[in-house]
Regions:
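Active-site Asp-x-Gly
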Residues: 267, 279-301
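Short small-residue beta-strand/loop micro-motif enriched in glycine and branched aliphatics
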Residues: 110-112, 165-170, 287
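ATP-dependent phospho-/nucleotidyl transfer catalytic cores
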Residues: 165-269, 281
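Conserved protein kinase catalytic core
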Residues: 109, 165-166, 277, 295-297
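Catalytic-loop signature of eukaryotic-like protein kinases
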Residues: 271, 275-278
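Conserved NTP-binding catalytic cores of kinases and kinase-like/nucleotidyltransferase enzymes
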Residues: 1-152, 267, 280-285
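Short pocket-lining segment of the protein kinase catalytic domain that shapes the ATP-binding cleft
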Residues: 156-164
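Short alpha-helix boundary/capping segments
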Residues: 116-120, 171-182, 294-297
């Protein structure tokens, strides 16, 4: 039941909640710049810390034991990624994974700061821990272990989609209409699975609206600064329409995001560019990198 003072109380509560989220983001960012070993975790922080005992526990669903795991490639970026080639104590089983993908704490303090402030690692670990099982096998890689701690320290043990014929795409790749249609089918399945889900008030409470995401206020501030810098720079000959739009967005960005939140709520991937997708031999399409997921109308994807 509403009371005559609700219109006064709600903005205050929202402001306090926003301040708390920004405070948490700053604490996370502060922890991120510390040397990795200074913040203890109950899990390996990097692929180099992963040993056979840890992997055997993560892969205990399989009726065999690992006898070796060696890196066969990897990249560093927003997170560190290493592909491991696996050797098992049994050669008579065809369904054992031959590789896994380790996604872990960024080696760069700069990248850790961004990942920590925006809770990107926590988002992805919780997605695989709580939400992944509600989706079909094509939507995302299978996850064997998901851990996240303070200051962007995290580690995921993921299926290597290449082992089932998956083809990760790059931003510069060309696709055809069939790939685009398959992506729409994947997004439809994702959004339908969590459409107005009561789980958003339960185990999926971490899937917040965009404006409630940790660090989002800091992100908007950064975007404003970039637009302001572009507007003041003589280096770019910006058309009048672009200048007017940049000024409008700078003045109204919070209201714009509030308007974009209107409508039926579901879980969205939040970063559906081509480089976060992969194709499968049957023509279906899946999604990688679930760090930016949030709750919104499905059209935002």
């Amino acid at each position: 039941m509403s009371t005559p003072t609700d219109h006064l109380v709600r903005p205050i509560v929202a402001g306090l909640s926003g301040t708390a989220r920004t405070g948490r983001a700053l604490v996370e960012a502060a922890a991120a710049v510390l040397p990795l070993a200074w913040v203890p975790t109950p899990f390996p922080r990097t692929a180099a810390d992963v040993d056979l005992d840890f992997l055997n526990r993560a892969l205990s669903r399989f009726p065999a034991r690992l006898v070796d795991a060696r890196p066969v490639g990897g990249t560093n970026g927003t997170t560190d990624r290493v592909r491991l080639e696996l050797a098992w104590n049994r050669d008579d089983l065809d369904d054992l994974p031959r590789h896994v993908f380790i996604k872990s704490t960024p080696s760069s303090a700069k990248n850790r700061t961004m990942v920590a402030a925006l809770a990107l690692a926590r988002n992805e670990a919780l997605f695989y821990e709580r939400a992944r099982s509600a989706l079909g096998p094509r939507i995302a890689p299978e996850c064997f272990a998901a851990h996240a701690g303070l200051g962007a320290r995290h580690l995921l043990v993921l299926e290597d989609i290449a082992d089932r014929g998956g083809d990760p795409m790059a931003l510069c790749d060309d696709i055809d209409a069939a790939y685009a249609r398959a992506m729409m089918a994947t997004l439809g399945e994702l959004h339908a699975a969590f459409w107005e889900s009561p789980r958003f008030r339960g185990d999926l409470r971490f899937v917040r609206s965009e404006r409630e995401r940790p660090g989002f206020a800091l992100l908007l501030r950064q975007f404003r600064q970039v637009r302001t810098k572009l507007l003041k720079s003589d280096e770019y000959d910006l058309p009048r329409e672009v200048r007017e739009m940049a000024e409008f967005v700078n003045a109204n960005d919070w209201a714009l995001h509030a308007n974009w939140e209107r409508g039926p709520q579901t879980l969205i991937h939040g970063d559906t560019h081509l480089g976060n997708s992969f194709g499968l031999p049957d023509g279906s399409v899946g999604l990688l990198d679930w760090q930016v997921l949030y709750r919104a109308p499905g059209l935002r994807d």
